[in-house]
């Protein structure tokens, strides 16, 4: 393969660029004579900062603009935080590669006056910042004595708001903090028993044209099979529930002895109703595991909970 040029579409946020530059570096290191360039842009989710993500109600908030660049031939691939990539992609595009996963857990970040507390010991009335309905519902279920407020902006902006005293603590993805060099600000990794993470959290998804065999061959070098198996199960679970990135659906997955165990959760917005179950299956059929787990939760009332949430979104 000689003198092949590859263009990446990326969000222009600092975290997105760190992730995209990592992909660029890995590809150029492993494939001789490959020239990789980056087209950075703002997405709808980057531009609308004064409205809670759930109220915007669009499943492609952080991806549509990047996908448009590929569909018109201006980019060959798009690098996404996999948790932001909808489970149903536009015609002509596919998820071509899933990279090795960073820690998928949520993390507690506190300001100096609260560094003696863990999430479970925060005083009544403490103000917790999060933009995620998934985190909000689970934490309301566990800690109804805390006050939860929406927080928008990139990771750095959110930490600045925390340190300025607007919040006592904030919840962020551990992976993003580590990739941006803020690992020292992680006060607590939140156990999955308290908060299941988002579908695909911690992994990068590389999207490309479905029929571009050369590009698929190039990006396959970054594929991590165990991560891919786990994330495909998680995404099948979300797809079967017809949920999106902004609804209270959480997961956890692990692989042991050629078996994949997937735990899933659906909760009401107030956290009062929370359904959780798990399904174990053949590691080589991850999507079936996700579908079966979704069926289990539907039988326990997940569809009713999600229907109520979607109805509230429509009213707004």
Curated annotation (Swiss-Prot):
Catalysed reaction, written as an equation: 4 porphobilinogen + H2O = hydroxymethylbilane + 4 NH4(+)
An annotated GO BP: chlorophyll biosynthetic process
Cellular component, GO, one term: cytoplasm
Entry similarity comment: Belongs to the HMBS family.
Enzyme Commission code(s) on record: 2.5.1.61
GO molecular function: hydroxymethylbilane synthase activity
Additional remark text: The porphobilinogen subunits are added to the dipyrromethane group.
Quaternary data: Monomer.
Cofactor: dipyrromethane
Keywords, ordered alphabetically: Chlorophyll biosynthesis, Porphyrin biosynthesis, Transferase
Residues bearing PTM S-(dipyrrolylmethanemethyl)cysteine: 245
Cofactor: how bound: Binds 1 dipyrromethane group covalently.
PANTHER family hit by this protein: PORPHOBILINOGEN DEAMINASE
PROSITE patterns recorded: PORPHOBILINOGEN_DEAM (PS00533)
Pathway listed: Porphyrin-containing compound metabolism; protoporphyrin-IX biosynthesis; coproporphyrinogen-III from 5-aminolevulinate: step 2/4; Porphyrin-containing compound metabolism; chlorophyll biosynthesis
Protein's name according to its UniProt entry: Porphobilinogen deaminase
EC primary class: transferase
Coiled coil regions, renumbered to chain: none
Summary of the function given for this chain in its UniProt record: Tetrapolymerization of the monopyrrole PBG into the hydroxymethylbilane pre-uroporphyrinogen in several discrete steps.
InterPro entries named in the record: HemC, Porphobilin_deaminase_cofac_BS, Porphobilin_deaminase_N, Porphobilinogen_deaminase_C, Porphobilinogen_deaminase_C_sf
Cysteines paired by S-S bonds: none
């Amino acid at each position: 393969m000689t003198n092949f040029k590859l263009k990446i579409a990326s969000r222009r946020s600092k975290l997105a660029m760190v992730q995209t530059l990592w992909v660029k570096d890995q590809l150029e290191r492993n494939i001789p004579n490959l020239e990789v360039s980056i087209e950075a842009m703002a997405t709808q989710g980057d531009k609308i900062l004064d409205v809670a993500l759930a109220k915007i109600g669009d499943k492609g908030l952080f991806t549509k603009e990047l996908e448009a660049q590929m569909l018109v031939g201006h980019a060959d691939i798009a690098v996404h935080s996999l948790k932001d990539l909808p489970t149903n992609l536009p015609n002509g595009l596919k998820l071509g590669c899933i990279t090795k996963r960073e820690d998928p857990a949520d993390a507690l970040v506190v300001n100096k006056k609260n560094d003696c507390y863990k999430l479970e010991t925060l005083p009544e009335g403490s103000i917790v910042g999060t933009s995620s309905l998934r985190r909000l519902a689970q934490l309301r279920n566990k800690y109804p004595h805390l006050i939860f407020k929406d927080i928008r902006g990139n990771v750095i902006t959110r930490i600045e708001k925390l340190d300025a005293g607007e919040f006592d603590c904030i919840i962020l993805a551990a992976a993003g903090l580590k990739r941006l060099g803020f690992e020292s600000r992680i006060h607590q990794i939140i156990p999955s028993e308290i908060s299941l993470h988002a579908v695909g959290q911690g992994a990068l998804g590389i999207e490309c044209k479905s029929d571009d065999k050369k590009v698929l061959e190039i990006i396959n070098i970054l594929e991590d099979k165990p991560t891919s198996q786990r994330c495909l199960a998680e995404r099948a679970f979300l797809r079967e529930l017809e949920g999106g990135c902004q609804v209270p659906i959480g997961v956890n997955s692990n692989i042991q002895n050629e078996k994949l165990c997937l735990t899933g959760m659906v909760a009401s917005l107030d956290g009062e109703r929370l359904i959780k179950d798990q399904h174990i299956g053949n590691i080589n059929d991850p999507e079936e595991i996700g579908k079966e787990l979704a069926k289990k939760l539907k039988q326990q009332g997940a569809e009713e909970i999600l229907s109520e949430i979607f109805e509230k979104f429509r009213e707004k």
